[in-house]
Structure formats: C-alpha cells, structure tokens
Amino acid sequence: MFRSLAICTLLSLAAAPLQAAEAQAAATNPHFDAALAQQLGADAQGMRRYVLVVLKTGPKPLPKGPARDAMFKGHFANINKLADAGQLAVAGPFMGGGEWRGLFVLAVPTVEEARALVETDPVVIEGEMVAEYHPLYSSAALMQVPVLHRRLSPQAP
C-alpha cells in the first residue's frame, strides 16, 4: 500500500509542471491584440473605467418651438463632439418615455470629469434634463462603438 501511495505521489508530482504549463497556455488568449488593448485603454482583463450618466427629466422642460429645437440641436452636436474627442463610448435615448430620458457612457475615470463634460450639454444647462452619475467598469471594447456606428448609418451624424 505504501508503495502504491508513493508511486501515485511521484506521478502527480511529475505531472504538476505539465498541468501548470497547460494552465498557462490556456490562460493565454490567442486573439489578444496588445496594440488594440493599449489604444482602447484596456487593463489586463480587457476592461476600463467609465462613468455611466443617466439623463432624467429636469425641472424646466422647454415647450415645443424654436428654442427647444435649438437646444436639442446643440445636444446632438455635443454628443458628436464628445464622440470625436474619444470621451463618449455610448449614447442613446431610453424608449417608452418616462423620467429616464437617455444615457451616456463616458470614457473618463471619475465622476468629476464626467460632470465637467455633461455640464456643457445644452439640455442640462437649460434644465430640460438632470444627470445622475455612476462609476462603471466595463469592456474597453465599448470604445469601438462610435467608430462602428459611423459605418452603420448612411446619414451623416
């Protein structure tokens, strides 16, 4: 019995380096693109920090008319400016009405930086919407959304 135990122990010790090598090989991603990861600001898990901004109905909604149209034109221009600067990963409206109007996923690490960007948006300046800020840790691949989105619509942004 001792001999069987000793043989099993020796075999398991001999197999340990092989198992470790297999585990390391399995942990290496054959699709990993170091240059892309660096470009997108990815950490070792392929993730990065963002701030999720939820835009809610504000205290001063503007009535339909030229002032409201101009405000929203400025809002969309601000979205494009943030995307062009690489500061906006995702933006869009919530469907179905209600208090929640839209969202931004800003590619900044702190709420303070997000607040500084959002406070330049006409819908926030005018009080049409107010913003809630939530730190978010998500895939760095979100940074590709603006690049891909431009290729999906035949209309200019």
Where are these regions (language model features)?
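Bacterial N-terminal signal peptides
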Residues: 5-16
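Conserved, structured core segments of small domains
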Residues: 21-157
